[in-house]
């Protein structure tokens, strides 16, 4: 019997930002949805600005499953995952999880998911990584906006990194200009049909 459906629903139980006080709790499923949506927007901006075509199906599927290994590893914050001592062992652990998660699936589905998870398109990986970073930054902005002082240094650090990335990636700069200048919006008029 396959565990895929259970894994999908279990991701709702995997908290993000564990160890940090949050006004609004977040799980991996919620985060994945935001990363998918942001990846789509970034892709559209990149295509427009650079005049190129990106395989959106591959991109969005990769974004959908980008953190599926956290069903086993749980969410580990980036500074820990990217620590020079822990980075290689952690990546090896993630590979081991990827290789074992979908063992009992029909071969075609297993092959498809394996192809998605082991995506070697660097452009797609980059867009999803940027979307992942933008989502973390947005989360920190929301928490700070609500008065959570625990996220002030997180917001500053993520914002500085984002500012540096926008110097190299015009589509990120465009995203920042379009969506992040006043985020989160104080006035949510879009909720009312006037």
From Swiss-Prot:
Keyword Lyase: no
Keyword entries, A-Z: Cobalt, Hydrolase, Magnesium, Manganese, Metal-binding, Plasmid
Binding site for 4'-phosphooxetanocin A: 16-17, 75, 78, 81
Cofactor names: Mg(2+); Co(2+); Mn(2+)
Domain of life (superkingdom): Bacteria
Cofactor, free-text remark: Is most active with Co(2+). Shows lower level of activity with Mn(2+), and weaker activity with Mg(2+) or Zn(2+). However, Mg(2+) and not Co(2+) is probably the relevant metal in vivo. The metal content of the active site is modulated through substrate binding. A dinuclear metal center is observed in OxsA-OXT-A-PPP and OxsA-OXT-A-PP complexes, while a mononuclear metal center is observed in OxsA-OXT-A-P and OxsA-OXT-A structures.
One Pfam family in the UniProt entry: YfbR-like
Binding locations of Mg(2+): 31, 66-67, 132
Documented EC number(s): 3.1.3.112
Keyword Transcription regulation: no
Residues binding oxetanocin A: 17, 75, 78
Enzyme class: hydrolase
Catalysed reactions, semicolon-separated: 4'-phosphooxetanocin A + H2O = oxetanocin A + phosphate
GO molecular function: hydrolase activity; metal ion binding
InterPro entries reported for this sequence: HD/PDEase_dom
Function: Phosphohydrolase involved in the biosynthesis of oxetanocin A (OXT-A), a nucleoside analog with antitumor, antiviral and antibacterial properties. Catalyzes the hydrolysis of phosphooxetanocin A (OXT-A-P) to generate oxetanocin A (OXT-A) and a molecule of inorganic phosphate. Can also bind and hydrolyze OXT triphosphate (OXT-A-PPP) and OXT diphosphate (OXT-A-PP), and thus catalyze the sequential hydrolysis of tri-, di- and mono-phosphorylated oxetanocin A compounds, releasing one molecule of inorganic phosphate at a time. In vitro can also use dATP, dAMP and dADP.
UniProt family annotation: Belongs to the 5DNU family.
Subunit structure: Homodimer.
Protein name, per record: 4'-phosphooxetanocin A phosphatase
Lineage: Bacteria, Bacillati, Bacillota, Bacilli, Bacillales
